Design a protein with these regions (language model features):
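Short glycine- and acidic-rich boundary segments immediately preceding or forming the N-terminal edge
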Residues: 31-34, 55-118
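Proline/glycine-enriched tight loop/beta-turn segments at coil->beta junctions
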Residues: 116-118, 125-131
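Short HxH-centered metal-ligating active-site micro-motif
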Residues: 130-149, 185-186
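Primarily a LysM-type cell-wall glycan-binding module
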Residues: 1-28, 48-67
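Stable alpha-helical elements in mature extracytoplasmic
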Residues: 17-21, 28, 86, 90-93, ...
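Active-site/substrate-binding loop(s) of hydrolase catalytic cores
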Residues: 144, 151-153, 157-292
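Short acidic beta-strand-loop surface patches of small beta-rich interaction domains
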Residues: 33-43
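Metallocarboxypeptidase
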Residues: 237-374
Length: 374
């Protein structure tokens, strides 16, 4: 994935020098330090969308004059706009995110059935007090969750980078103390199928029409490209999900596979959690305006208080127990006894219309900010 360095300064910066430069350029100190901690001669400027290329300057004053027109504002289209993503568009967006907010770390945690990368976006705080995982688009026709999550992330990063933003100090605290892990598109093949059709993936429509119940419209497709529901793939009473469904074969929805963790996307997500043992997990789905927060009594006591805060800021209804098993959140709670929440965004029938986006985002952004408070 392409990244670009901007603003090359031909001298070493000590810590005091970094603070002075950040102040003169109007960049939050934490974002500036985290962006430049491994750089000695390339000055990386979070919160600026600069033209590509390496630009050489003689002084910080020259840098300040050059970058001034390129500072991002909360009202800018890239920050405040509404974007829809397939896997290719996601990759382009991640490249922009890395260029504009260099303190973000982007890596591949696995690959889909069709070898599409599954990306994780990370923050690496100086003082690691908490770890929080957020994910979206486990289900293919719930791709609007990716749009919501990335818009919120851009808002968080801009607030951390710009001291005049209303949530600057809150964002700085998150950046300094919380290791964020974000997987914006768990099911890239499925999203591509729903958004672009099988031909875009080099696949035959006839095969997928059979899996899709005879329909050539893929808007209701939830599964991965092999017809396995990724959110029924985890070893947390998986057998219940397997035996309760009449279909024992791949399908556009609900089929849990022949056994747990057969699918590369599910394996990647399980391995990520096993490596990092997050303190809190938030899985974004649609729809229902509900928050599922318990699993058979394995959830920690603090979950009850946390979900009350989520309800207060979002208006979403907390539901402790649900007749559902083998989901990522279910397994996470069962495996680690840590906080796990499935947040069902919006109301209606999947895929939700983008006409709902603004309403969904307003409620969800408040919940996500709250989720980063530990």
């Amino acid at each position: 994935m392409k990244t670009t360095s901007f603003g090359k300064i031909e001298w070493q910066l000590d810590e005091a020098g970094r603070d002075a430069v950040a102040k003169q350029l109007g960049i939050g100190k934490a974002a500036f330090h985290l962006s430049n901690q491994s750089s000695t001669d390339n000055l990386l400027l979070p919160g600026y969308r600069l033209p590509e290329g390496v630009h050489v300057f003689d002084s910080i004053g020259d840098v300040q004059r050059f970058i001034s027109p390129y500072r991002l504002q909360q009202s800018d289209d890239w920050i405040n706009g509404t974007f829809e993503y397939d896997s290719a568009q996601l990759e382009e967006e991640l490249s922009r995110l890395k260029a504009v907010f260099p303190f973000l770390h982007i890596s591949v945690i696995g690959h889909s059935v069709l070898d599409t990368p599954i990306y994780e976006i990370r923050t690496e705080p100086v003082q690691h007090l908490h770890s929080i995982h957020l994910n979206a688009s486990f289900h293919a026709n719930e791709w609007i969750t990716t749009s919501v999550l990335l818009k919120w992330l851009k808002s968080l990063c801009l607030a951390a980078s710009d001291p005049v933003q209303a949530r600057h100090y809150e964002a700085v605290h998150i950046l300094q103390t919380t290791a964020l892990s974000i997987v914006p598109m768990v099911n890239p093949d499925g999203v591509d199928l729903v958004r672009n059709g099988p031909e875009s993936l080099g696949l035959h429509r006839e095969e997928f029409t059979l899996l899709n119940g005879g329909y050539t419209d893929y808007r209701e497709w939830k599964a991965n490209i092999r017809g396995v529901d990724l959110n029924n793939q985890f070893p947390a009473y998986w057998e219940i999900e397997y035996y309760r469904h009449q279909s024992k074969a791949p399908s556009y929805r609900d089929y849990p596979g022949r056994e747990p963790l057969t699918e590369p996307e599910a394996k990647a997500m399980a391995n990520l959690a096993l490596r990092k043992r997050f303190d809190r997990l938030i899985a974004l789905h649609t729809q229902g305006e509900e928050i599922y927060w318990g699993f058979l009594g394995h959830e920690p006591a603090i979950s009850k208080e946390t979900v009350k805060r989520f309800e207060l800021v979002s208006g979403y209804k907390p539901i402790q127990y649900l007749d559902s098993y083998a989901g990522y959140r279910d397994w996470f709670i069962y495996q680690f006894h840590n906080e796990g929440y499935t947040v069902e965004l919006g109301l209606g029938k999947n895929p939700l219309s983008m006409d709902q986006f603004d309403s969904i985002y307003e409620k969800t952004k408040r919940l996500l900010w709250e989720a980063c408070k530990c």
